[in-house]
Structure formats: C-alpha cells, structure tokens
Amino acid sequence: MAAAERDIAMIDELRSAKVETSWLEFKVGNCSPEMIGKYCSALSNGACVEQRDRGYLVWGVDDSTHDVVGTDFIPEMCKVGDQPLELWLANALQPSIAFSFQTIEHPDGRLVVLHIPAARQTPVAFNSVAYLRIGPTT
C-alpha cells in the first residue's frame, strides 16, 4: 500500500469513531495558536490515559458528522509574533514532545493532521498548565 493510501485509510479509520475522544479532535478551520497548544496538552495526556501511542488533531473534518470538508489551514504559514507556529508551540509545551503536522490530500478535501505523542512520565503542559479531555471536552 502506498503512503498516500495509508494516510487516507488512517483518516477514514479516525473518522469512523462515533464521537471525538480524549485523544481525537476534529476541526474545520480554527487555527488559533492558543487553542492548538491547549489541544496538544490535552490530547497528549488523554492518549496516555487511554494507553494509546498518540493523539490526533485533524483539520478539515466536521466534528459532528465526521465528513471530510477540507481546510485552508497551512501550519507552515502561521506565525505567533515573529516565530513560526511550530517553534512557538515547541517552546510552550513542557516536557518537549515530538509532535508533527502532516498534510493529506483526501479524495474529499485537503486535511491537516497534528500527530501528538502520548505523555510519558509526566503530563504535558501548555504554558505551565496541564490540560485533559473528558471525552470530547477539554
């Protein structure tokens, strides 16, 4: 199976979840850096609690229907002050985690996935606050 097919299969598997979870969040267009930081903390900690390897924040999927609607969010174009979003986020998360953004061209629209490793020995905090999700709520 080619990488693009694996990526689409991963997205379709995530979309098959009946509801968002402590380790999975869908967004259409909200790309607020503060929101992304809070979700990184919450999804990392939620993945740890649920004994998953990682959490996911997916842009371009409707959070109520789980339909692919696409997104125009381009993480590489976002800045916080003079810093690129990824650098700003890396500095705001403690302990440091190896998150990564991925763009996926799904047949129904362009998606961006933020892969967030599960917290390990200590909860992940954003700006010194550790967040946690209870089901779909942060």
Predicted regions and their residues:
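Conserved N-terminal catalytic/coupling substructures associated with nucleotide/phosphate chemistry
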Residues: 1-138
